[in-house]
Amino acid sequence: MQLFSIYLFYYLYLKMEKFVVFGRYCEDAIIKREPFREQHLKRLKNLKNSDILVTLGPTKCAKYLFGIFNANDVNELKDLFEEDIYWEKGIWINYDIYPWIQAF
């Protein structure tokens, strides 16, 4: 049974597409995000452990965000992104999602 679960996981994982996300933070995001940061990071850790999140973070200037995700389609990722506390509280103010083909 465990072998089947592992096989199923990798089958579903390989069927998922990769997406890149580019977005923008609100003004003074470093300060405004503080009350929500712990909840946000806990959620990201769960997404990372589930192999949905590959990487996510701000650019050095802290005006933009960049992420790579695994999802079945754009709508699934859009829903997932908008469930984040940073989106709900206006820390992230816009984003674009692009299907991505990992060359190597």
Language-model-detected regions and their locations in the chain:
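Conserved, structured core segments of small domains
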Residues: 16-104
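Short, Lys/Arg-enriched N-terminal segments with co-localized hydrophobic residues
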Residues: 2-15
